[in-house]
């Protein structure tokens, strides 16, 4: 979710109309920080309500789960992913599509995206399992993480 809050703030600063929809009001320390920054940009936020129709949105950022997700999507997250998939919007997934396992690319219900932006590194799950049929175009966003060889050389 933290990636989504950063993206929302950057888009708002660029003059793009943004709305954050939360599945719950529970944040990690980093998530709370970046959510507060997004809200400071004047971005409205609301809690997900079952049955919400997302068909009026042009673009949706899928930032529900990241590469550490394993298991089955349930509850509000499952409802939100179904709505994303029915929206007809251009869907951008951060790191990996919500619902896909970052190691295996397997998953039941998952977000189907037009574009998946890997943050820092590609994950094995981008190329395995169901991933090739649901990730859309895949690009990597270099965030300046040094390759292991350079880190070891620095030590």
Q: What label would you give each PLM region?
A:
Residues 1-63, 72-94:
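Nucleotide and nucleotide-moiety/phosphate-recognizing core
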Residues 57-155:
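YjeF_N-associated NAD(P)HX repair module
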